[in-house]
Amino acid sequence: MSRYSATEIEAKWQEAWDKAGIFRAARTADKPKYYVLEMFPYPSGRIHIGHVRNYTMGDVIARYKLSNGFNVLHPMGFDAFGMPAENAAMASGGHPKDWTYKNIETMVAQMKPLGFGLDWSRMFATCDPEYYGQQQALFLDFLEKGLVYRKNAVVNWDPVDMTVLANEQVEDGRGWRSGALVERRELTQWFFKISDMSGELLDALDTLDDWPAKVKLMQANWIGKSRGLQFSWALTEPAHGIEALDVYTTRPDTLMGASFLGISPDHPLTKALEAENPDLAAKVAEMRKGGTTEEAIEKAEKLGADTGLRVRHPLNPDWELPVWVANFILMDYGTGAIFACPAHDQRDLDFCRKYDLPVIDTFVALDDPKPIATEAFVPLKTEKVKWIDHFAGLDVATGQEAIDTTIDWMEAKGLGTGVTKFRLRDWGLSRQRYWGCPIPVVHCDACGVVPEKKENLPIRLPDDVTFDVPGNPLDRHPTWRDCACPSCGKPARRETDTMDTFVDSSWYFARFTAPRAETPTDMAEAEYWMNVDQYIGGIEHAILHLLYSRFFARAMHICGHLPEKSKEPFNALFTQGMVTHAIYKTTGADDRPVYHYPEAVRLEGGKGYLEDGTEVEIIPSAKMSKSKNNVVDPVAIIDRFGADTARWFVLSDSPPERDVEWTDAGAEAAHKHLNRVWNLCDRIAAMDSAAPGEGDDDLLREMHKCIRDVTNGIESFGFNASIAKLYAFTNTLAKSKAGAAAQKQAIMTLAQLMSPMTPHLAEDIWAHQGGEGLIAAAPWPVADEAMLVDALVTLPVQINGKRRAEISVPADMDKTQVEKLALSTDAVQKALDGAAPKKVIVVPGRIVNVVV
């Protein structure tokens, strides 16, 4: 072998894998299937080191399963629609399509040198008409089955991106991409009926045994099942034909602490009152400026307006309460109306203190009954409290006991009904932008909203659009909107809204099973390949993507595109940590931070210096950010060290669920180790096969232990633990005095065990040592159980708990034989002095204790 040149060997073996078609997947009856998938990337233009870590993890699993006799599907594609492409077009004067496909071309060229065992023949981008045409077909099927509908709704409007955002896309009251403060608007929108599946989506979480508990908890909280009471409050005087207001509450036990009745700014009564009261209308308009998400509403300043209306308390008709419009009340959760109990709800208390409304205790702490000041008393529902003249006769009880008792009492009196509700709301999918999947419906003056015919799909996006002004170019296009009604043939208008990009990623995993099919899926292929056996991606997708995908899988099953078993599409989920890097910062002349590239900083004695000697502040383990100049370019790493070094390091330094900090020193150490393995192979290849050796069994015993430990590590996603065992075995092999045959067996096994992590180096060692075929297709080594037992173990011998001797015995020696050997030692014989021991305790492989 010559000098280790990663560049030369990596290109050679990638070509060999392609030529052999090792990673091309096809149905077969003679192997079990295994589908491994990493969340596909957005084509931003360049891959980053986080991509390398994510896809290397998936590749380790895919290669390992392939070596274990599985028929592996490991595809790759691109989540390609979305605002960044439009923003780039606006900035450059180009076209989103050109920008996107150029970026895909660049990223594929960057990914292939990493040696991922991917079936590139299945690659697609969600902006391919062949893909989004099938997505349009799914939309029509969902529409036919009543899973999608259109209605007027108050939505989150991003005034910068000029589009609607789903609740999940609003973070801290701002658009998730633009960062703009979100506004409320009422628009006609398309919605998926995900709320109809709330109970099923929640209950099925219990079946996902191989999902992280944290992800399941996040989804459960988002779905938000609650049990409460729905009941009516009669208005003292009817208003606009409304005689009573229905309220849903999860804390009916606090009914006697009511301070006011609140209604949403979007409640029908609010809208009716606005029309006749300009002052109220102005105040409500101010309330509607924030977003519609619970988070945005919770963080917003509490705003309210007294309507002048009053209601009668359900338990005391003489007790009248004011009706207020409040900006923190959601129209589409519950009934859009609440009763406020400020003593036991911080939001209500803040509102009441601001508007000088009464605060009434309904219960107090058992040990320290304090009056309510600025902080509401909100104990856990499992905590016992002292009730104050509770109408259902409660004295001391937990919150949950009080809720259950109150619901039963109110139902018995005919005053209300116990109801189960969910927080999960229907998914608004309409977006007012160009670069997305067109919604396949037509608006006809004669027929109304008409679904497009499937034979006319895909409804393609027009190429001749401009982005010189904000808004949706489809609205301004001179001809694209115009079409014939599919029903009556008269002139009609296309829907100009496009689909939320989360639709695109909610079913791509199913499309990978038959990416060229002329229907959304080929059921035979879906029946064979689904479900995804191992899905890998970030925890940040716990609610959005993963919940939507679970809904889509169910909807596709209803429409005949997925089998029953695939209603839960991902059997196992792994959420990986990030790759971080230190930030190097100084302060500029204007007191603003200046961030420096890592290569511009000299590290010395734990400190960092610029070329001119200026010391920089080092912020360790920071999230990589282009704006902070701490992004690691994988292409530069591959050019310098090779793909195998990058793969090895991102797996070796931290458990995969945790963040790992990229350091040049760590990468250099990884490269040094791979060089060492290469040189070790050279040394073993040059050994005299006839020369005697010693310790063959010891070396092979350690080899089989390494097989066991590396296998267990990969099976449990403990890649760093597997690599630690490979380091240790490399050291053992380097020091071994065993004969050539044993060392050759050991180096070839080491190559096999390293092959999922460093596939190129492993292939070269395998070939150099005379391995048959490609290591990527070779069977995974199996540990010999007989070789996992150490030849001899040393056991301490205690007499009455004190160590007096030790014996060396075969590790698998019978307990009776161990006892006899221990009793024959001089120390035990002397202690017994001819008598029999009271007891002998043998702990196999650990210790012998003689009681005299």
UniProtKB/Swiss-Prot annotation:
One annotated GO molecular function: aminoacyl-tRNA deacylase activity
Q: Which domain of life is it from?
A: Bacteria
Enzyme Commission designation: 6.1.1.4
| Pfam families xrefs | Anticodon_1, tRNA-synt_1, tRNA-synt_1_2, tRNA-synt_1g
Please provide, in alphabetical order, the Gene Ontology terms of the cellular component aspect for this entry.
cytosol
Q: What keywords are annotated for this sequence in UniProt? A: Aminoacyl-tRNA synthetase, ATP-binding, Cytoplasm, Ligase, Nucleotide-binding, Protein biosynthesis
User: What family does the Swiss-Prot or TrEMBL record give for this protein?
Assistant: Belongs to the class-I aminoacyl-tRNA synthetase family.
User: Which protein, by its recorded name, is this?
Assistant: Leucine--tRNA ligase
Gene of this entry: leuS
